[in-house]
Amino acid sequence: MKSFSPSTLVWIAVASQLGTAQNCPILGPAYPAVANLAAPKLTAAKARFEKALESINRTSTSFAVQVYSAHDDGLIYSTYNTATERVGAATVGPDTIWRLFSISKAITVYAFLAKLGDGYWNEPITKYIAELADAPVRDPIRDVNWAEVTVGSLAGQSSGLTRDYSLRDRSTVQTQIPGFRELKDSEIVQCEALRMIMKTYPWAPSYRTPNYSTMAFQLLAYAAENITGESFPDIVVNELFKPLNLTRSYVPIPRNETNIVNYPKEAWELDLGDLSPGGGYSASASDLSALGRSILRSTLLPPILTRRWLAPTIHTGTVWHSMGRPWEIMRHRVPATPASNVTRNVDIYAKQGGGGVYTTAIALSPDHDIGISVMTAGDETQAAFNTIREAFLDIWLGAAEEAARDLAEATYAGSYAAKTAGDNSSIVVGLSPGEPALFVSELISNGTDVLAFAVNDAGRGGKGGQFGLWLYPMGLVDEREKGKKRVAFRGWPGVVGVELEEACGSWAESDRLRWGNYPGDSYVFVVEGGKASTVENPGLGRTFWRV
């Protein structure tokens, strides 16, 4: 049998990945997230964000905005504005209460997960709401096939159900609309929830296409009540509000509060009843930020459950938006550096709410461990909200990416070498200008220049430029030893400056080499006192020490 040296085998695997020779980022962060809220790039973003918000009409629109990190209980940034025209709060601040409207859907799912986990997602809803099991399916266009509607599809806007059964039905407020059919008394919408839900038309078969449904979350709450024997408002309070000390959050709208935004009064006092799990909750900006921070931290859920939750479940008709449970996932292109035309895709897990003059949102960037809470109300609320949203995407995500890049350079960049006498092995780690991720520009193993060997043996995929390895963090961190942590990265070979192709497939090209079951593309750094002291490649069987 022909034998190969470890170095040769490493680059046989590398050669197979050189067809495009591009820096094709994997899904996930390019660098470990920044924990320091005073990082210079984050500090500089505040003034830019304030400048972007100058276009908002502050006379007619009240708002509260908080940007926060998973790594600190404080805020990276906050700003508040009290409209001088019809606002309902003397002074808007961090504890002012706003109607959340459809953000309630995310809170409902969070409470369900905290109480019951996600083991029920694939179960049919008919198992937990017996009345639905008795509903006949005579006409597939007229009748919902409830046996195909799962608990998870209700949470993920993929149940195929219509929007709701009464909120937008004009028969609740007027007896006749010119040109519309006359209704029998039995057809007029009343407060018999399940009977009316069973009378609704389907939107589509479940899991075919996403559709916005508020009543889906009413059914999700009914299922939780039938499983646990507890009222759903009690589940929300006991599983979320109390453990997180959310003292300015409410399932029923508070009637005796004065620090509220209640313009118009009718919108504030709207009682959604059993539809509240889909839009009836209220909270302050500070409480909403604490809720978002707890998700990023996995405070109430096991980390594996959080990772399953922060994932798409179905796509929409645009490549830039997908749906989760019930996340409205925006895919945003973040530049590697401010002057670079090289970008990577960052998924933002958001839930927006709105009704009347209110527009609200919670948005999380797991790649950066940051989030934002946005509350707006007033005559120009949508324009204000859009300005804040775009500024968050363009300014705060870019700043978080830059801050993480600076931290990665300070922590990991440098020259490392073997300590063993006579072992000519070394590695140089740094950044490639205008490209995401750490970059290995030199790698010598036992006297062999493995980067030169690889590019000479396999070529550059027809591309010019410097050849090397991009290192991406894998979310695997060992902190068992006090004062030290081991952080795992994986390496992807390529050529600097190659334009990214939409069809790049780094996820399918990784981990191609095993040497005695040791990975050849793994790089494990030991960080002490905020600085990497060593880097190990298990496949090469070498540890390199900072020099």
From Swiss-Prot:
Pathway assignment reads: Antibiotic biosynthesis
Against SUPFAM superfamilies, the record matches this protein to:
beta-lactamase/transpeptidase-like
Disulfide links within the chain: none
Q: Which InterPro entries match?
A: Beta-lactam-related, Beta-lactam/transpept-like, Beta-lactamase-like_AB/R
A Gene Ontology biological process noted in the UniProt record is: antibiotic biosynthetic process
Q: What GO annotations for molecular function exist for this entry?
A: hydrolase activity
Q: What is its EC number?
A: 3.5.-.-
Q: Where is the signal peptide?
A: 1-21
PANTHER family linked to this entry:
BETA-LACTAMASE-RELATED DOMAIN-CONTAINING PROTEIN (PTHR22935:SF97), PENICILLIN-BINDING PROTEIN (PTHR22935)
What's the protein name?
A: Beta-lactamase-like protein sdnR
